[in-house]
Amino acid sequence: MQTSPLLTQLMEALRCLPGVGPKSAQRMAFTLLQRDRSGGMRLAQALTRAMSEIGHCADCRTFTEQDVCNICSNPRRQENGQICVVESPADIYAIEQTGQFSGRYFVLMGHLSPLDGIGPDDIGLDRLEQRLASEQLSEVILATNPTVEGEATANYIAELCAQYGVEASRIAHGVPVGGELEMVDGTTLSHSLAGRHKIRF
């Protein structure tokens, strides 16, 4: 079908987003052009600024437009002595929304995967080791994903922490709140049973 080259280019560009196929990209493009051109302009400006100005925090490697992000530069967070290791900046947002963690973070931007040629230095573990050696840390909380690669990465970091006398802990995995046991997979249920705790009154 003959169409505007710019429109085709817009739809192709939108397809770089996760989960966006040809139909979704077409719907987005037509919606912006037909109903919300001002919103499209705001999106374009925000995207241009974000792509050119957002980099990585020098301490934790999350996304920020500053040299050091707001979390790492917070004195109260620095005094906490805890670092939570996560695989992506999106994990920080998820944990921050709980309001249960008041320490700082370290973002791996992935996980160990020897089959894909991803080793310790590729996910910044050399920089994490520098922090273990130079900072007064009381605990490193390992919040990598509950996958084979995530577990292997957590175990590697735990061994690294032991070399520097820093306590390492792993976030609990188990039955989701509101879930039914019959719907939970065997691996998750095994983790739940192994990680059970006593009820105190």
Curated annotation (Swiss-Prot):
GO terms for molecular function: DNA binding; zinc ion binding. It holds the Pfam family RecR_HhH. GO terms for biological process: DNA recombination; DNA repair. A zinc finger (C4-type) spans 57-72. Keywords: DNA damage, DNA recombination, DNA repair, Metal-binding, Zinc, Zinc-finger. Gene3D superfamilies: 3.40.1360.10, 6.10.250.240, RecR Domain 1. Residues 81-176 form the Toprim domain. May play a role in DNA repair. It seems to be involved in an RecBC-independent recombinational process of DNA repair. It may act with RecF and RecO. Belongs to the RecR family. NCBIfam families: recR. This is Recombination protein RecR. It comes from Citrobacter koseri (strain ATCC BAA-895 / CDC 4225-83 / SGSC4696).
